[in-house]
Amino acid sequence: MKIGIIGAMEEEVTLLRDKIDNRQTITLGGCEIYTGQLNGTEVALLKSGIGKVAAALGATLLLEHSKPDVIINTGSAGGLASTLKVGDIVVSDEARYHDADVTAFGYEYGQLPGCPAGFKADDKLIAAAESCIRELNLNAVRGLIVSGDAFINGSVGLAKIRHNFPDAVAVEMEATAIAHVCYNFNVPFVVVRAISDVADQQSHLSFDEFLAVAAKQSTLMVETLVQKLAHG
């Protein structure tokens, strides 16, 4: 099995990259792909860049170049669920765009023409992630993750997301674009991210302060998940 891993930022991939043995690096379309073995398992780690277009481009390049069997999207996220705090884990059961609106033509809010309203994560990957969470004794929430090209740092944007997606547990800027590409390629995916901030008017301050905490936690989760997927 070859496992694809996608993170947007240098801070979100550096700890995993340093753990890859026999590492080789290739740059495609402004994205960096690192291939090798993570604890003996073949992996391809992509640093995509921030935002939906960068994430979709990166996911496509990773799937075409490295041909992984599954995709894990890692990194940080803003917490929406009331039980979440910095360092906690969110696992997707579905991903949706929070900034797409074609409702004038009868689509659900967040749905694009020709696409489902949401992109479902793979049940086996979800189960494996939840098993890792239990083993590591981490606080985690599973649910809807929403994505858009905005860092949510104010009451207006937050209120809009809560209104349109009351069940959303986290918000970030890449996951749904990655899920969209995986849907088109028919490749299983799951989003496993750590909370860097609670989406509110001070979230930019929290993000800067706690990104390293989120990166450490998400790296731990992904490393454990890769082992579980490789060895059952």
Swiss-Prot record:
The active site is at E12, D197. It catalyses: S-adenosyl-L-homocysteine + H2O = S-(5-deoxy-D-ribos-5-yl)-L-homocysteine + adenine; S-methyl-5'-thioadenosine + H2O = 5-(methylsulfanyl)-D-ribose + adenine; 5'-deoxyadenosine + H2O = 5-deoxy-D-ribose + adenine. Its EC number is 3.2.2.9. One of its GO terms (biological process) is L-methionine salvage from methylthioadenosine. Gene3D superfamilies: Nucleoside phosphorylase domain. Pathway: Amino-acid biosynthesis; L-methionine biosynthesis via salvage pathway; S-methyl-5-thio-alpha-D-ribose 1-phosphate from S-methyl-5'-thioadenosine (hydrolase route): step 1/2. Substrate binds at G78, I152, M173, E174. GO terms for molecular function: adenosylhomocysteine nucleosidase activity; methylthioadenosine nucleosidase activity. InterPro entries: MTA_SAH_Nsdase (IPR010049), Nucleoside_phosphorylase_d (IPR000845), Nucleoside_phosphorylase_sf (IPR035994). SUPFAM superfamilies: Purine and uridine phosphorylases. The keyword Secreted does not apply. Keywords: Amino-acid biosynthesis, Hydrolase, Methionine biosynthesis. It comes from the Bacteria. Coiled coil: none annotated. It holds the Pfam family PNP_UDP_1. GO terms for cellular component: cytosol. It is an enzyme of class 3 (hydrolase). Catalyzes the irreversible cleavage of the glycosidic bond in both 5'-methylthioadenosine (MTA) and S-adenosylhomocysteine (SAH/AdoHcy) to adenine and the corresponding thioribose, 5'-methylthioribose and S-ribosylhomocysteine, respectively. Also cleaves 5'-deoxyadenosine, a toxic by-product of radical S-adenosylmethionine (SAM) enzymes, into 5-deoxyribose and adenine. Thus, is required for in vivo function of the radical SAM enzymes biotin synthase and lipoic acid synthase, that are inhibited by 5'-deoxyadenosine accumulation. Homodimer. PANTHER family: 5'-METHYLTHIOADENOSINE/S-ADENOSYLHOMOCYSTEINE NUCLEOSIDASE (PTHR46832), 5'-METHYLTHIOADENOSINE_S-ADENOSYLHOMOCYSTEINE NUCLEOSIDASE (PTHR46832:SF1). Belongs to the PNP/UDP phosphorylase family. MtnN subfamily. This is 5'-methylthioadenosine/S-adenosylhomocysteine nucleosidase. It comes from Salmonella dublin (strain CT_02021853). The lineage of its organism: Bacteria, Pseudomonadati, Pseudomonadota, Gammaproteobacteria, Enterobacterales. The gene is mtnN.
